[in-house]
């Protein structure tokens, strides 16, 4: 009897942040760990970034480069999958890209960043040439939305760019119980990019119409300046700052809140909006990045221009006062999350990218 040869799994070396890092990239990668992706492919994770002091970050980067250099000749991965962003992350990932090219291993560069204009469009000619050169070394770019594909197509051919939307884990929660119909939630890094300095003006208008409304500002960053903005408006009694939340603390906030307010100025495809969709919250956010692909204005939430304090306040007030509208928006948003943004759908698409890139690499 002939013995059927067992097919070798495609080997993936994935360059990732430490699992405890705050932010969207780590959230995406943490969903891969222990998932069906690890059954389908042989995956090795190389951590290249951590939170902490400058020296801790430097030490993690050096250790990451060392681990990667050992992986390439010993394990000979079929594909290197790099998670990157703009700014410092771009420069930290350059050695991984060029080392992969040195060993003739194809590179998938998964770009999570949001500030393309500041990093590339407004950069000097020499910096743009460097960015062009680095991205053209990659065999495939993964971007978060069709809008980002159009932007990156200025640099590399469109057929080398694949849209891979972020995903959300769909909770099985009883949405009709335990939800505070007056609680509004923000989750993210506290600062200017996320629109946090617009929050006091928005909230002043909201509490003038709905005095019982409460705002939870969950996140770290520029907490004290943001808090002072609320204090100057006499609004601190209506606002709580629990700090950065994760795990069950984050689940609890999403499950008990009624409205998700995210007045951001710049995004790729924010994980927190997907999470709010999965929990069926009434969502008020802005028309930036990949958000219009997630939220249909007047159907699954409300979209406003960044900085439109009046518009966002009016939208929040309506969702707090009209339960039926809020529940209709939330129900549609959750349905969209289930149908289009599940982890399973995301992993299936990523798996097809791996197989396509690996095949081309073997033929090269």
Question: Where do the language-model regions lie?
Answer:
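Short hydrophobic beta-strand element within catalytic cores of glycosyltransferases
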Residues: 282-285
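Short alpha-helical donor nucleotide-sugar binding micro-motif in glycosyltransferases
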Residues: 244-245, 252-257
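Aromatic "clamp/platform" in nucleotide-sugar-dependent glycosyltransferases that forms part
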Residues: 265
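Donor nucleotide-sugar binding/catalytic pocket of nucleotide-sugar-dependent glycosyltransferases
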Residues: 130-173
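Conserved donor-binding/catalytic core segment of Leloir-type glycosyltransferases
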Residues: 13, 176-207, 216-218
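Conserved acidic donor-binding segment of nucleotide-sugar-dependent glycosyltransferases
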Residues: 297-298, 302-309, 318-323
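A short, well-ordered alpha-helix in the C-terminal region of glycosyltransferases
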Residues: 311, 318, 325-340, 346-352
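Nucleotide-activated donor-binding/catalytic signature segment of Leloir-type glycosyltransferases, i.e.
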Residues: 227-245
């Amino acid at each position: 009897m002939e013995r059927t040869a067992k097919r070798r799994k495609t080997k993936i070396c994935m360059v990732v942040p430490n699992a405890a890092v705050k932010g969207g990239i780590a959230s995406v990668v943490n969903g891969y760990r222990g998932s069906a992706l690890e059954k389908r492919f042989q995956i090795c994770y190389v951590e290249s970034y951590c939170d902490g002091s400058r020296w801790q970050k430097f030490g993690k980067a050096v250790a990451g480069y060392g681990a990667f250099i050992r992986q390439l000749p010993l394990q000979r991965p079929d594909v290197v999958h790099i998670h990157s962003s703009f700014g410092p992350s771009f420069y930290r990932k350059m050695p991984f890209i060029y080392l992969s090219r040195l060993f003739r291993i194809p590179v998938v560069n998964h770009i999570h960043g949001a500030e393309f204009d500041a990093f590339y469009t407004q950069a000097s000619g020499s910096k743009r040439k460097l960015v062009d050169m680095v991205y053209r070394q990659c065999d495939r770019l993964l971007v978060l939305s069709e809008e980002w594909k159009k932007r990156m197509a200025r640099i590399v051919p469109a057929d080398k760019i694949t849209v891979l939307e972020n995903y959300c884990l769909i909770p099985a929660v009883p949405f009709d119980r335990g939800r505070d119909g007056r609680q509004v939630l923000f989750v993210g890094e506290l600062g200017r990019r996320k629109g946090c300095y617009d929050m006091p003006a928005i909230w002043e208008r909201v509490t003038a119409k709905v005095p019982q409304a409460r705002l939870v500002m969950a996140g770290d960053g520029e907490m004290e300046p943001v808090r002072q903005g609320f204090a100057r408006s006499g609004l601190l009694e209506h606002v709580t700052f629990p700090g950065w939340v994760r795990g069950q603390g984050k689940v609890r906030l999403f499950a008990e809140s009624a409205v998700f307010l995210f007045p951001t100025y710049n995004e790729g495809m924010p994980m927190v909006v997907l999470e709010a969709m999965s929990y069926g919250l009434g969502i008020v956010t802005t028309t930036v990045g990949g958000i219009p692909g997630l939220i249909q204005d007047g159907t699954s939430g409300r979209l406003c221009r960044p900085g439109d304090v009046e518009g966002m306040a009016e939208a929040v007030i309506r969702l707090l006062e009209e339960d039926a509208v809020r529940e209709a928006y939330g129900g549609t948003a959750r349905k969209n999350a289930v149908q289009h943004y599940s982890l399973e759908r995301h992993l299936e698409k990523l798996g097809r990218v791996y197989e396509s890139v690996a095949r081309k690499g073997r033929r090269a």
